[in-house]
Amino acid sequence: MAYKGWNSDSFSMNSELFNEILLYAHLDSSGIDSDDLNTNPNTLENEINSVEKTLNIEELKKITTALNIDNRCNICSIINICLRHETDKMWIYDYALLCYKCNAAPRTPLAVVIIATEFMQLIQKHFLNINFDGLFLNNILSILDFHVHFFINRCFSNTNDDLLHNENITLYHMAILKSLLLEDESIPNIRIKKFKLKGKPTKKQHGNAILEKQTLPLNTHFTHLIFYMWAGTNIFDRISLTDLAIKKRQILKAIYSTKNELNCSAGPILLSQIPISITKNATSSVCLLCELMTSSQKNFDLLQFIYTSVINYCQNNLKMIDRIQFVLANLLDLARIYTNVKTTSDCSKIVLANEQEFSNSDFVIDCHSFLILKQVGPVGLYKHFFCDPLCIANIKTIKPHILFYTTESCILQDFKVAICYQNEYLNSVEKHVWLAIHFFKAFQVSKLNHKNKTLISDFLKDFTQLLADQNFEIVDPTFTIHYYV
């Protein structure tokens, strides 16, 4: 079957490749918290846990080698091997389409796992004579390699004039991730103003008519994978998914690996742009609404309908949270899915069946989207639409007409060739803006010591101005940075 990109037909909860990627997106369990160790350090149990914590830090250091600026990109190395062994151009054309889709995708855990799985499927499909087994098992690849290649450094994109400017952005971006994973007490001190002054917006140089031919909708439905990925974690703390969490744990444990006991309570957190599992004031570090809009056209349209309805709800000066509550109540009352979906018990069977659906000329809502709206509630919608710069950057980035569509079969190959030779992957959000946003998110999940408090104060002055310059319509980040995650 011809590769079309972002096609859920090639994904399932039982897929060995998909589950292997999920497995290696989990961190190992770290025993007890370091604060507990300090309370009573002399017990045998705490000594054992201290050793385990040391071993886990060593494992993290191994994983985070992908975040060293002077370390090779392992994805690029694999691509180089493939280019030397290909007998035709079919592989590179498929890879170009994958990059084209990636460029139109938001930065979400679901997007990362789709990109990683499709990349692995492509190299296995095109190079039967090369053994790609054990890439994760033998530490040749890690999940962070996909972050670096496709999202942080964007190795596939065409270069700008200032190579060292780009190098420094990548360096600082990786330093933030590394400090979070290694639980450093302080975040790297980054002056975003110098990047703001040097950053140059990319402009489209030329067009190609065939790139406008994506007119056929793909049968894309990834929503069930969201529930599978995050079942049994605090991301779904209002929705019980016990059976699904047990099924996932059994499947992952059956995969041969050298990993220790998985931290299942955090889930596949290495897929997240901010790999820290935390909840705060009815929000979580993984935004389920960003995941939802990544999953299908109908879910993207549903969120667009909710946003438009909130903005246009009435002419009175209602607060946004009140508008959201009224719109959400009206929508759920109209759909009435809640009459058949009881969220007081385990919802695993409901997720797997997904039998209830309501649609009209404005939106479609099914059991999956209903449960996610139930989980996030009005506060989650408020944070997603109006407060979180990462969510708003994702909304600006996603291009559903690229992500969820394909061309007619007769021109699909020409379409891939056009992408490859045009080699133009334009940013909706510039790299220095992504860096600043991830700096912001790092402050949200880090411990507030004296040094970090000083950094936050200086950072917010520049960050607020940067968002204004980039036309981010957003609630004052000074509120969000301390109140949500």
From Swiss-Prot:
Keywords: Host cytoplasm, Host nucleus, Metal-binding, Zinc, Zinc-finger. Residues 287-391 are annotated as: Zinc finger 2. The keyword Zinc applies. GO terms for cellular component: host cell cytoplasm; host cell nucleus; viral envelope. Residues 73-155 are annotated as: Zinc finger 1. GO terms for molecular function: zinc ion binding. Pfam families: Herpes_env. It is found in: Host cytoplasm; Host nucleus. Its main location: host cell. InterPro entries: Herpes_env. Zn(2+) 1 binds at residues 73, 76, 149, 155. Zn(2+) 2 binds at residues 287, 290, 384, 391. Belongs to the herpesviridae UL32 protein family. Plays a role in efficient localization of neo-synthesized capsids to nuclear replication compartments, thereby controlling cleavage and packaging of virus genomic DNA. This is Packaging protein UL32. The gene is U36.
